[in-house]
A protein has these predicted regions:
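N-terminal leader/capping segments at the start of a protein or of a new domain
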Residues: 1-55
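Nudix hydrolase/Nudix homology domain
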Residues: 2-6, 16-18, 22, 27-31, ...
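Short hydrophobic/aromatic beta-strand or adjacent loop that forms the aromatic wall/cage
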Residues: 1, 86, 160-164
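Acidic, metal-coordinating catalytic segment for phosphate/diphosphate chemistry
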Residues: 43-88
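Unchanged
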Residues: 114-203
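Active-site beta-strand termini and strand-to-loop segments that position acidic
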Residues: 91-94, 167-169
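Conserved beta-strand and immediately adjacent loop positions that scaffold enzyme active sites
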Residues: 88, 97, 186
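Conserved Nudix-box catalytic region and its N-terminal flanking loop in Nudix hydrolases
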Residues: 27-31, 40, 92-129, 134
Length: 227
């Protein structure tokens, strides 16, 4: 399943045979939502124009696309869009806490654009280091990708694909420095149990990232009481 976010609205690409249980449940929930609109691709040209049409149809919150080839449909949807690749990190420390940043009055995670000749893991590490002023980072694994759209400075519809990695930080948590040039106002370390209150003030794409991360990272799993 792929979600393309248009602010808090989204286009969802799915198939009838989602491999992940979470995706199956998400699709079922969306299909039962009366505000969901369905689109069945049959014409490549119409599919290419769909993102531009969706930006105008602001009364539609969710547009579901059923397809047998999700990647091909994603490529078709993005064919006429400006494409940007970015890398970012969900950072945890030795105390099992998560790093969040406050940017433009919304809680977010550090991320940024891939530079020429740079592999995506290097991008993700560099951006976390620059935006948070921390080093001693180690990538543990890739979590997922998220897709969101925006209008660039030339008023062209742009899609940013962000590759998210779980990173472990082995330094002192007091050593963070928000990058003011990127409008980062605050950096906090929080316990996983505190996360829901922060997700009340964040982007839908970040909520999706954490939904995936909770199925992968041990810090989100219930701790067994020790005798």
């Amino acid at each position: 399943m792929y979600s393309l976010f248009f602010n808090n609205r989204r286009i969802i690409i799915y198939s009838n045979n989602e491999p992940k249980q979470r995706d199956k449940m998400t699709v079922q929930h969306l299909l039962e939502d009366p505000s969901t609109v369905h689109f069945f691709p049959g014409n490549d040209q119409k599919t290419e124009e769909l993102p531009f049409l969706f930006t105008k149809l602001t009364n539609i919150e969710k547009l579901m696309i059923l397809t047998s080839d999700q990647e091909a449909t994603l490529d078709q949807l993005c064919k006429k869009l400006i494409k940007i690749t970015a890398g970012g990190g969900l950072v945890t420390n030795n105390e099992g806490e998560l790093l969040l940043i406050l940017r433009d009055n919304l809680w977010d995670l550090p991320k940024g654009k891939q530079e020429d000749g740079e592999d995506i893991e290097t991008t993700a590490l560099r951006e976390v280091e620059e935006e948070c002023g921390i080093k001693d980072l180690q990538i543990k694994n890739k979590i997922c990708e998220t897709y969101h759209t925006y209008m660039n400075r030339d008023n062209n519809l742009t899609i940013k694909c962000t590759y998210w990695f779980h990173m472990e930080y082995h330094g002192k948590k007091t050593k963070t420095t928000p990058q003011k040039e990127e409008n980062i106002e605050q950096i906090v370390w929080i316990k996983p149990t505190e996360l829901p209150q922060y997700l009340n003030n964040t982007y839908e794409s970040i909520k999706e990232l954490f939904a995936e991360a909770t199925t992968q990272l041990s810090i989100f799993q219930p701790q067994t009481a020790k005798n």
